[in-house]
Design a protein with these regions (language model features):
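Charged, compositionally biased interaction regions
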Residues: 1-289
Length: 289
């Protein structure tokens, strides 16, 4: 992981023990600055395995833990306040036998209702190709990628968003309001189209990446976590997760303040030109801003 994210492989002798592991890590030195922790039974470095467990084992109604008003990293510009942010723990581990959701809890303990797919009894539900096609044709959507059958990323063009090289120092209330309005409208439209509520993960981000290009998984891992504040950009409702990772536009007048946004640390054009003289393979799309 990195300062926004840690993916944790956790042993579980007891129900929900992986959550305790994550909470313990938040007390371990620099780990206290983490924004998002994902607990899994799989190899943490395997991004495809991570997508699989997020799709197959995360019930938004019971597997998310949000810690509000925690210590944050000084290098975290997306947070509402400097050095303070909310944290998100995602439990994507298998259910142990004693978990009340397993259907066979300890004697005397009641059963907690749980979807069959969360218990591993059937495949996780997902959206159809026809619904994906409908969503892709919505006005305002630039591109979309179905990461797994219940996980969709859509990209949008946000007018007035901070320039990657220069960032944005001062509030732009008009552009920020237009951004909030556009994102909310798209979320509502997609939720309405998905009347069966099969789409559990909906991510929206800027169109400055190539969803179908080389290295997209790693680029998304960075972009979806660095441009996102748990306290401002996460909506969990009716068993569905909405995750806004469009570049924040500084604002003081919205429901939640947005601080100045820094420019990305990038190689200057002269350095890139000097490297190009060596006739090396071209930079992958998703490494170029």
């Amino acid at each position: 992981g990195f300062h926004n994210l840690a993916i944790v492989k956790s042993k579980q002798r007891y129900p929900r023990q992986a959550r305790k592991t994550c909470l313990g890590l938040l007390g371990a030195g620099q780990m206290m600055f983490l924004k998002i922790l994902v607990a899994t039974d799989e190899e943490p470095s395997d991004l495809n395995a991570l997508l699989d467990v997020l799709n197959d084992r995360v019930d938004p109604k019971s597997d998310l833990t949000i810690l509000d008003g925690m210590v944050g990293d000084s290098l975290e510009p997306a947070s509402t306040y400097e050095n303070i942010h909310s944290k998100l723990i995602i439990d994507a581990t298998k259910l142990v036998a004693a978990d009340p959701r397993s259907g066979n809890p300890l004697e005397g303990s009641p059963v907690e209702v749980c979807p069959p797919w969360r218990k591993g009894e059937e495949d996780a539900p997902g959206i159809s190709e026809s619904l994906l096609d409908e969503i892709s044709k919505l006005d305002g959507i630039e591109d979309c990628l179905l990461l797994r059958n219940s996980m969709l990323v859509v990209t949008v063009e946000i007018e007035g968003r901070p320039n990657p090289r220069t960032g944005a120092q001062w509030p732009n209330e008009e552009s920020a309001e237009a951004q909030r309005s556009k994102i909310t409208q798209l979320r509502n439209l997609i939720w309405q189209l998905d009347s069966q509520k099969q789409l559990r993960w909906l991510f929206i981000t800027d169109n400055d990446l190539d969803l179908h290009g080389e290295g997209i998984n790693r680029r998304l891992l960075w972009q979806l976590t660095s441009r996102f504040a748990v306290e401002r950009d996460l909506v969990v409702e009716e068993g569905r997760i909405f995750w806004d990772a469009t570049t924040p536009i500084p604002s003081n007048e919205g429901p939640s303040p947005v601080r100045r946004w820094p420019g990305i640390t990038m190689h200057d054009p002269e350095t890139l030109e000097a490297i190009d003289r060596f006739n090396l393979p071209p930079w992958p799309n998703n490494l170029v801003m």
